[in-house]
Amino acid sequence: MKVKTKLFRLIMLLLCFALMFVTGCSNNVDVETATDGEDNDEVDTFTAGTEFVSSGTQDGYSIVADNANYTLLLDESDATLRVKNKKTGYVWKTNLTEDDFANQPNIDEGVKAEYMSQLDLVYYDGTGKRINYNSYSYAVQSNDEYNKTVAYYQLPSGKDGIRIVYKIGENIDDAYFPAALTVDTYNTLYEAMDDEGKFQLELYYLEGLLSYKTLSDAERSSVMAEFKNIKKVDIYKSQPGSKIQMAAFVNDYLKPVIPKIYDGSLKEWLEEEYEVLGYDFELPDVPMFVVPVNYELTEQGLSVNVPTDELQFEESFRLYSLKVLPFFGTVTNGNKGNMVIPDGSGALVDINTQSKDSISIPFYGQDYSLRTKDYAENMEQSTIPTFGLDVTDATYGKNAFVAHVTSGEGQGSVECHPKTTIYPFSYLGPTFEIHPFETFKSEGAAKAAELQKYSDKPYEGNITINYYFLNGEDADYIGMAKKIRNIYFGDKEKLTLDKTKFYYETYGEILRKETLVGYAYNAKAQMTTIAQAKAIYEKLKAGGISNISVKYNNWSGDEFVNSISNVGKLAKGLGSKDEFVELIQLVEKDGGTLYPNLELMLDKDTGELTDATWHSKMIEGTLATYAGRSTLYQEGVTVPFDRTVIKTGEILSKLDGIVKKMDKFGAKGYSLSTLGSTLFSDYNKNTLTHRENAKLKYISILDKATNKGEKKLMVEMGNAYTYDYADDILNVSLGNSNLMFEAESIPFVQIVTHGYISYSGSALNLSDNKEMTLLKSVEYGANLYYVLNNASPSAVKNSNYSSLFSTNYDRWYDEACADYKAVSAVLDGVQSSCIESHKKLSKDVYMTTYENGTSVIVNYGSAEYTYNNTKVPAKGFVAVK
């Protein structure tokens, strides 16, 4: 990303003059400089490239690219791109066009302009004012031969597509109306202009000739106060008109001739002219944003890329966010269809649903390093950066697209907007945060004011969105999920075991508040020792439960006083190393895995100065913290839930030592739970890591911890960047957030992962509605998961673990055995199979079919349901083979 700076220009001019004596430096100085201060070849993004030349026309549009499946077309009048499906004839447009509003005569012109835009940006000016620009109103409409604001270029060799560069910004041409001109400049302009331009130039300037020799003493004093160099040059002072008139002169007559007489921008030309005149006037920065977008036609659809390091704008403006193709595929003709959004497991939104509500869903969940941002509460997490839309058309049949964000998703979110009385068409698309900031209130001033503090640097990386097009029977959420599954797992081997898994999670050492002679202190207590964990495991096996994998938390001590230097050490009160090794081997002998949980991301906040050197920070400079659970359980506890976030670089530097510690126990796998459920940015000045860059470092941690996938891995929730490494995922969402405009939840995530990664929903014995969670687990192909401890409920009193008060294994043993027996009866045999289809048979009955031919029917209703002579009990399920 590049910004324009006056200081850089001055420095370069001085250097250039010095070098002229040695190398003959050119007098043309590039004023673009990268924000990171690195040396680089400065290139004007707007003019760099080979001009696009169409290979022909089709349907009245320029042909950009063509392959066996699709044709990419461009309307050069408004920059709209169309992808035509050769098989169905259906056309996907990057944005709406004028003809889409034929039945909307009363639509607001501003709303129409939004729909007709490919880009929408938000920036903040020097006063902190939020301003929104869209590419149609602020680029396409102002584009003409004299004022180019949209340019078309070829993609690099070997790529089929087009690069469109937009100059998106405000027209403040009146500010560039010259207050005066030297006589020489006037004459140069006059010669370069056409007859109408000459007339206008004379009209504004010819009567204003000022020469020091002809001025009276009184006039000299007055004129010199304004134009200090009047002794050296004769000038024409302007006779200014209205703002509209002056802007028209600049736009219609001055801009077209500047390229003929000057190698630079209008602003640079005028600044040099004012310097010659000795006229002190600082020209305003132009709120103009140069944004390049690369569109590449592929065999499967369209790839869209925005290289944010090539964005250009004045440094006095802060580009906060950028929407890329927010109206791609928007349906306007009343057809039926659904938007597919990554809300939890996935959700459908009918495109004909009207609602005043909308939602923005951040990919990979909330960034807890940004505390003042508004996030919707109680939302299920988005774990896959994808979204889609399907439409059924009477002429073209069923068509759909699924979009997958492959770079920049750490900065991104997807926005879903049902139609309203003002916005007549539903739409969804991605937004990316370019320059994060926090808002604070200044309480010390006479009147409280909001202050903005930005990260030291904006995000400078790629944004890439791949659109895959589907038709016919594949044009629904199932086809979309299969396409995404093939992207993540197309080259992976499936699971080998078909037996249903049982996940048993337990806790070792905790701290609880106790008192001695009136003094409160934190005493160590054991929820489940190693010997007790073994006993529970043996009892579960005796009860008929098999294929058990164990997650052992707090085996190095209470996680709320975690220290990364302590990770990998066995807490003394839990048992011996030999006992731990024996338990690990026992579980593995039976075909399962014992996953000791390694908390690599979070540390206890000690308050010491050294914490700042190896912990992540928020924008305002304080340490980034994370609680991970509701503060409702915090009452009376002396150990805070909030822990500090460890820098990814610090984790990588200590990881070899941690792995060596684990090798001494013979562990074949670990749980890195937090790494799969949270993604933290770091705003340390020296180690600034935007969320997208943090994602890449997380992947490095996963790669190193698992020795490139040789070790088994368990994570929580399962953000998609863990898919290459995860064997087991706990707490996968089994539903959506139940937003008012959502039609229903869908197993999108499960269709993507089933057969390749084992997973479970939330712990059954901690669920608010155990029966519903069990039914959902069966419908979505999830394994069973219980949290079981040896300690009695009273053990968690006055601790950070009050939420575990009902996890004593004696309380849940019989139910766990019964649940496993019932669920394994229908899910055994499908664990290595992908989900082939998912159907709603009636209001409360759903059927999931696997590629091996097995169908599992789940009845949520209160009455028995019959399917092809198979009876499905109320609140029950059956397998049909």
Language-model segments: what does each one mean?
Residues 2-11:
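Bacterial N-terminal signal peptides that target proteins for export
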Residues 21-24:
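C-terminal motif of bacterial Sec signal peptides marking the signal peptidase cleavage site
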Residues 26-28:
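Bacterial signal peptide processing site
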Residues 43-46, 64-523, 534-543, 547:
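Carbohydrate-recognition beta-sandwich/jelly-roll modules
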Residues 74, 79-86, 103, 389-429, ...:
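Active-site-proximal substrate-binding groove within the catalytic cores of carbohydrate-active enzymes
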Residues 476-480, 485-487, 529-539, 644-671:
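An active-site-proximal structural segment forming one wall of the substrate-binding cleft
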Residues 498-651, 677, 681:
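Aromatic-lined carbohydrate-binding/catalytic grooves of carbohydrate-active enzymes
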Residues 547-549, 593-595, 668-671, 712-714:
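Structural preference for beta-strand elements that scaffold enzyme active sites
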